[in-house]
């Protein structure tokens, strides 16, 4: 029951719908943009193995815990901790999670705006053979007017989807966009591994060099696991609050984690072969690496 309206609280239409929606929340720039960048800066395959261990041993249990808290309380992060531990300081944890989400949105929305710009440029034929992709990226990132315009467009699209609610907004769109995203990544990965020089990229990504493993690399892998799974900011608590009591949260969390990790791995299979094909150095491109390479 939603206490603010007096009506029964909405729920996801099915377990599959929840998995797609939660995966859509977890899967994002943290996987496709953030993961290859951080992996390239921290040794490639060695980082990948530590990341996978962090996802399995830390990320998946934390996700399950957040989903349990959400479904048990059927409230947002602040309300959830207030319900579980009234008159305690735990409510601050929920507030910090919401604040963290706002901070992440502040730069996520900018990068998402760049993505919309690249979609438009692709449709209009900007990316032809031999084009200077680095110059295109620098022009967009260094020019405030188009960057802000695309940023605002993304914000408006987001507002439109969220206003639709759980079933008519988030669920409806993720049912379409998540399968499309996965299909595109598979096609891009197939294309990337067939490029000349792709073998060196695959070796960098899949053959671990444990001499590069340091405490900083381990911390980066754990942090990336939390970031790419959308943990610690209340997103999964919120999504869990709309899960039906009939659905099995353990298998749901496992499927969401699997989908998120699979897409992160696919992103690496796309980026690193393409990077070596273009003669670029892994990790040298920084945040713009994905936009320049692809």
Language model region names:
Residues 14-54, 200, 234-240, 251-254, ...:
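Transmembrane helix-boundary motif of multi-pass solute transporters/channels
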Residues 20-26, 52-57, 96-107, 153-160, ...:
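Hydrophobic alpha-helical transmembrane segments of multi-pass membrane proteins
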Residues 6-10, 38-42, 77-96, 109-167, ...:
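Inter-helical loop and helix-membrane interface segments of multi-pass membrane transporters/permeases
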Residues 2-12, 171, 175-294:
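Membrane-embedded translocation segments of transport machinery
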Residues 1-34, 62-67, 71-84, 88-95, ...:
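Membrane-interface "cap" regions at the ends of multi-pass membrane proteins
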Residues 11-22, 47-50, 88-102, 149-152, ...:
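Select transmembrane alpha-helical segments in multipass membrane proteins
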């Amino acid at each position: 029951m939603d206490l603010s309206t007096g009506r029964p609280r909405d729920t996801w239409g099915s377990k599959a719908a929840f998995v797609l929606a939660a995966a859509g929340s977890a899967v994002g720039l943290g996987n496709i943009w953030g993961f290859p960048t951080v992996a390239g800066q921290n040794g490639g395959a060695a980082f990948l193995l530590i990341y996978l261990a962090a996802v399995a041993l830390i990320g998946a249990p934390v996700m399950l815990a957040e989903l349990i808290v959400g479904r048990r309380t059927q409230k947002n992060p602040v309300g959830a901790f207030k319900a579980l531990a009234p008159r305690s300081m735990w409510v601050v944890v929920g507030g910090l999670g919401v604040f963290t989400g706002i901070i992440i949105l502040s730069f996520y929305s900018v990068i998402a705006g760049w993505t919309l710009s690249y979609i438009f440029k692709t449709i209009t034929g900007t990316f032809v053979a031999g084009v200077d992709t680095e110059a295109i990226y620098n022009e967009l990132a260094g020019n405030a007017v188009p960057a802000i315009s695309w940023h605002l467009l993304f914000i408006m699209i987001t507002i439109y989807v969220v206003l639709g609610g759980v079933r008519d907004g988030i669920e409806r769109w993720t049912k379409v966009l998540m399968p499309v995203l996965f299909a595109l990544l598979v096609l891009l990965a197939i294309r990337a591994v067939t490029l000349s020089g792709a073998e060196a990229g695959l070796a960098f990504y899949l053959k671990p060099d444990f001499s590069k493993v340091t405490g900083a690399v381990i911390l980066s892998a754990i942090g990336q696991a939390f970031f790419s799974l959308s943990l610690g900011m209340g997103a999964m608590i919120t999504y869990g609050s709309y899960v039906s009591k009939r659905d099995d949260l353990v298998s749901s969390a496992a499927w969401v984690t699997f989908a998120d990790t699979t897409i992160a791995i696919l992103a690496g299979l796309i980026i690193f072969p393409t990077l070596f094909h273009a003669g670029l150095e892994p990790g040298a491109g920084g945040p713009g690496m994905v936009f320049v390479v692809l």
